Every structure is written in structure tokens, then in C-alpha cells.
Amino acid sequence: MTTVHTFSILLFFCSLFSASLIIAKVQHHDFVIQETPVKRLCKTRNAITVNGMFPGPTLEVNNGDTLEVKVHNRARYNITIHWHGVRQIRTGWADGPEFVTQCPIRPGKSYTYRFTIQGQEGTLWWHAHSSWLRATVYGALIIHPTPGSSFPFPKPDRQTALMLGEWWNANPVDVINQATRTGAAPNISDAYTINGQPGDLYNCSTKETVVVPINSGETSLLRVINAALNQPLFFTVANHKLTVVGADASYLKPFTTKVLMLGPGQTTDVLLTADQPPKRYYIAARAYQSAQNAPFDNTTTTAILQYKKTTTTSKPIMPVLPAFNDTNTVTSFSRKFKSLRNVVVPKTIDDNLFFTIGLGLDNCPKKFPKSRCQGLNGTRFTASMNNVSFVLPSNFSLLQAHSNGIPGVFTTDFPSKPPVKFDYTGNNISRALFQPVKGTKLYKLKYGSRVQVVLQDTNIVTSENHPIHLHGYDFYIVGEGFGNFNPKKDTSKFNLVDPPLRNTVAVPVNGWAVIRFVADNPGVWLMHCHLDVHIKWGLAMAFLVDNGVGELETLEAPPHDLPIC
């Protein structure tokens, strides 16, 4: 009897294993990086694209699938591809940020990214992680539930990915290179886009405006992705309610809103029901700008939600969007986010970290002419975390240096707290705090460490809403607020029951956010502001997570085709 019972159990688990092998697939894709003529705003320029497409191809996978994407670089720039939000368990070599987990793919060379989607469902995306190439090199990564399972909400009638972006008439690489030379802020974009098109509020754009079809009574799942380089964006659909059901490939307790706010890097899944008169309605996005007196693109991009059998000549209905500086709307929106179910949040903390984030000003070096110091008052713009402006290596990637024990590439003395305590959000910050030190400093974590990070915005130069993205991990946002974080007062307000699970947190302007995660993924993982101008200025750091015990807690060996520097 016991033998038969044991055999039955073994047979059951063997069948489950076999079924999982059948269900899980390996998808193969080729990405050709190339220059492609692209016409926008009445002008044509050569843009860097994937397979000649802008935006690039949408990849659709199931939870549990493996992706193998071979990137062929036929453009003139070095490039890498980052799979934004993918956990990359033990596959850090496939994460993508240049000089962090790999050296860039040189022109004429190729590299294959291979990784498995594990325990994630929803909307993520991929993008270039070199210079400002992600202005046009990006696409959606849609993760469907494992076959046989379903959404935790009624299955929608249709699904549409909507990628919000920015467009420059000039070459974005030239834009950031000029800013780097001069020390000034880069020129702002010329338009925002939805799925690569500015929409008919811009010149020469009406015919190409994106149209999203829908039938009366249908429910559509809109997968909204902010792929803009430097701008948080409000998003809405005229006369329609949006039911938020997910963000960053994690399910949420559904809530209804009229407006979304997404920082660059963030995704939000919403259900929209076609319950209005059958007409044409604008889908619209415009800037949320929290930095005072900073120039920004104050235009509005549109697509059209078009009910079937509606005349295409009728003028779409325009929505009301919040004012560009409406932080109250942003706060009200973000505080509605809660995980779908109660979750296990780390309660005991092993590494309690406090990171200040913000801008800075470097004094003009004596050897520099004035033309290279065009920041405020003859300085050069910079940025930092805990007063350290992050510098990428150039001869080795950080992960390669760590894996091979190469000395002199980085240090592990990134500070756990700012070197000087001050009134972080005050108006009279000492000028002595404006100039950070530069370095390639990592913070070392033991495998399995329970980590809390307080992310504190500062008013150095100006306060601003910063979208902070952590590679290789999701984290729980257990609290957020305004002013200086006060552990005695604010800790008691933490949500340790059902906080949202994200990979990018919008740290409030003149405020703070607290995240928690378990360091269960060995490797070197970048944390940075997803405003690309800020990461260029040094608003970043990296965690070095040690291997654990055994193969399943150890970083995989580097692939044979890993690019060399």
C-alpha cells in the first residue's frame, strides 16, 4: 500500500514537471540595431531603431517562458538592451546596463540575452541602456499568465499597449553629448508621443495619429508604459473611467481614477469599458513637472479611442488634464496603490539604509573655458546619492570585475547614510553641500539580507519627483510622505500588510519614500533615477549581492559571447 502510494506521488510530480516543460517555451528573437529614416513634426532624420521599427517590436511571453534575443549592432554607436523590471534571477549577465552587467555591444558585433520570466505577470518593457539611445530604442514586454491560469479580474475583450515617449528633432545622442560638454542642462524634447506618434495637436502629425478601436460595451486592457526619457507624465482618456489593476507586472487591488501619473520607467495596467456614446475620444498625455523654474516640454500628445461605426471625420472629444505642477493629484493617485492580496513584507531589517537623492553643481575646473561651464552661475550640473556622484567604469563591467576578482574597478564603501545630516528639504541649504564627490562605490549585501532603503529627496539646486528604479529586484513601497523622513513619527504609518510591489518608485518632490526587499538575487544591481539626464549626471549607485549557498543561490557563469570592452 505504501509502495503504491509513494509511486502515485512520484507519478503525480513527474506529470506536473512534464506539463511545466510542455507549457514553458523558449522564444527566439533577433534585434537588428540600425539607422532608419523617421519623419516626425514635418522633418525626417535618421533614428536608431530595432528592426527598422519605432517603437521596436512588442514581445509577448507567458510567465515561465525563456527569452533568447540576439542583438546585432549595425548602428554606429555602442549599445546594450535592458529588460526593464525582469527579475533576472541568477542571470545578471542579461540585465543590460552598460559597464554595470556587461560591456556594450560594439558596432558590427552581436550578443544574445537569455533569461527566464519567473513569477511575473503584466506589463514590462525593454529599452537601450547606453547614452540616450533609448529615446527611440524601446518596446513593450507583455507577460501573460501561465497557460491554464487567468487574470485576477474578468478577461478583457481586447488588449492594447500604449507607450508614452519623447521625440527630439535633433539626434538625442548629440543633445546629451552637447550638454555633457557644456555642463548645462540638455535641450528639452520637441514632442511627446504615443506609440511613436505625436498626435494631431502637432504639425504634420494628424494622418499618423494612433487610433485605438473599440466596440460599445467592450472592456479593453490598456497597458500604459512611460518610456519618456526625462518626463513624468499624466495620462487620461476623455469621458472614461480607468480601473487600475496592475503596475510594474504586479497585480493591485482595483481602484478607479480619471488620471494616471507615470514616472519614466513605470507601467500601469488599466481596464476601460466603452460605456459612452459611440464617438471619438482623445487619449492624452502631458507633463507632470515638479522642479521649479526648470524648462520642460509643455505640449500634449494624443491618440484616439474610436468606437466602431463612428465617422472618422468627427472631431475627438478632448479631456481635461491636471495642471503641469498638480502634485496633489499625483499624491492622491499614488496612495491608492495596494497589492491585490496581503503580502509577506520583511519586518526585521538587516541593512537599514538612508539615501539622499538630488542634484548638485560642480565648480568649474580651472582648465575649463567658460563655454564648458554653462550650468548655474558658471558651474556644471551634477547629481548624486548620499553625496556620491556615480561614475561608470570603462575597461570592465562591474559584474565582470566582481566575478573575476579584478581589483581597482570599484570599491564597496558606498555610505549607508549621507555624510552630513542637514535639513534636506529646507530652503537654505549650505552651498558646501552642492558639490558631491565622484566615485564608483557599491554597497555590499549578504545573500538573504532584509533591506530597507529610505529615499529622501533634497532641495539642493531644486527638489523634484525622482523615479528611482532598482535593477534585478521588485520591492515593496511601505511608505511615502513630504518633508524630511522622521523614523520616530513616520515608521508607525508604514503599510506592512498590502503595500504595492514595484520596480520603480516615484519619490515625491520635497519628500521621501521607503522601500523594502530581500537580497535574494546575487550579482551587481544598479539603482538609479530614471530621468536619463540625472543618471548621466551621476544620480545612481549599485548593490553588490553576494552568492548564497548552492547552485540556486549563485550567479550563473558568464555567457561565451559576452562583449568585451
Curated annotation (Swiss-Prot):
Keywords per UniProt: Apoplast, Copper, Glycoprotein, Lignin degradation, Metal-binding, Oxidoreductase, Repeat, Secreted, Signal
Family matches, as Pfam families: Cu-oxidase, Cu-oxidase_2, Cu-oxidase_3
Catalysed reaction, written as an equation: 4 hydroquinone + O2 = 4 benzosemiquinone + 2 H2O
One of the record's GO molecular function terms: copper ion binding
Residues annotated for Cu cation 2 binding in this entry: H84, H127, H530
Top-level EC class: oxidoreductase
Glycan attachment residues as annotated in the record: N78, N187, N203, N298, N325, N377, N387, N395, N428
Chief location: secreted
EC code: 1.10.3.2
GO biological process, one term: response to iron ion starvation
Keyword flag Signal: yes
Keyword Secreted: yes
Family as reported in the entry's similarity comment: Belongs to the multicopper oxidase family.
The protein's name in its UniProt record: Laccase-12
Gene that encodes it: LAC12
